[in-house]
């Protein structure tokens, strides 16, 4: 394959082959097509959600629905995938731009809204996997309850317990019930520990992105994945 000019990718096909298709087809057969057609809805675009979105974009997931009501603040820069030039922008907008800088041909939908019981069902419509990445325990509970009520057949992946600077190896992926996985140490709450560090948040986000990928590819295993 010819060298790519600096800062340019000529076609979607060239990008897909260079980044994903050759390796994925060789290793997992039709996985590339599965990932390209998949939609993951990410609820919350902070430390977990922004990292998860970047991981999935780099793995070739074709459709990402980004949902968050907030704007980028300076306090976000220590652990979230935003830059100084993003300060003041809606997180969904800034994250979508970042994803398109990684993969110009990814399909993103950005909703800058606060998730409530009233709009939850409409926001989750069409998702192949639902990813919970909220900060607030109340918002997490509302999403989990609503998703299990309205879309019990859609896998839900949640993150709980990644605060502080404890060991990374206690962060795990656990299958809580049918179609419901939780990633984290299940203990460390930022309201108790008081700090969030980029490496530990990213470890939890990587766990979430990994089980999402395994679910999309039909590889999730009850014994191996909690």
Language model features with spans:
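N-terminal charged helix/coil linker that caps or initiates catalytic domains
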Residues: 1-40
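Glycine-rich phosphate/adenylate-binding loop
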Residues: 2-14, 123-129, 133-226
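Hydrophobic Val/Ile/Leu positions in short beta-strands of Rossmann-like dinucleotide-binding domains
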Residues: 42-45, 66
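Hydrophobic/small residue at the entry helix of a nucleotide-binding pocket
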Residues: 48-49
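Conserved S-adenosyl-L-methionine
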Residues: 58-63
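Glycine-rich phosphate-binding loop and adjoining beta1-alpha1-beta2 segment
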Residues: 68-102
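A structured beta-alpha segment of the ubiquitous adenosine-cofactor-binding alpha/beta core
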Residues: 92-127, 134-137
């Amino acid at each position: 394959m010819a060298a790519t000019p600096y800062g340019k990718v000529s076609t979607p096909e060239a990008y897909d082959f260079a980044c994903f298709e050759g390796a994925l087809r060789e290793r997992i057969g039709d996985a590339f097509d599965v990932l390209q057609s998949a939609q993951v809805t990410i609820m919350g675009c902070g430390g977990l959600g922004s990292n998860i979105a970047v991981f999935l974009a780099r793995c070739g997931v074709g459709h990402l629905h980004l949902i968050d009501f907030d704007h980028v603040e300076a306090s976000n820069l220590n652990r979230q995938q935003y830059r100084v030039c993003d300060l003041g922008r809606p997180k969904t907008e800034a994250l979508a731009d970042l994803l398109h800088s990684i993969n110009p041909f990814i399909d993103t939908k950005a909703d800058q809204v606060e998730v409530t019981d009233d709009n939850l069902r409409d926001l989750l419509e069409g998702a192949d996997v639902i990813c919970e990445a909220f900060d607030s325990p109340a918002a997490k509970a509302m999403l989990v309850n609503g998703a299990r009520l309205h879309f019990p057949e859609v896998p839900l992946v949640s993150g709980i317990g990644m605060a502080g600077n404890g060991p990374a190896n206690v962060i795990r992926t656990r299958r809580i019930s049918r179609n419901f996985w939780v990633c984290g140490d299940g203990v460390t709450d930022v309201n108790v520990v008081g700090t969030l560090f980029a490496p530990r948040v990213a470890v939890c986000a990587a766990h979430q992105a990994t089980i999402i990928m395994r679910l999309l590819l039909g590889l999730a295993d009850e014994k191996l994945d909690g």
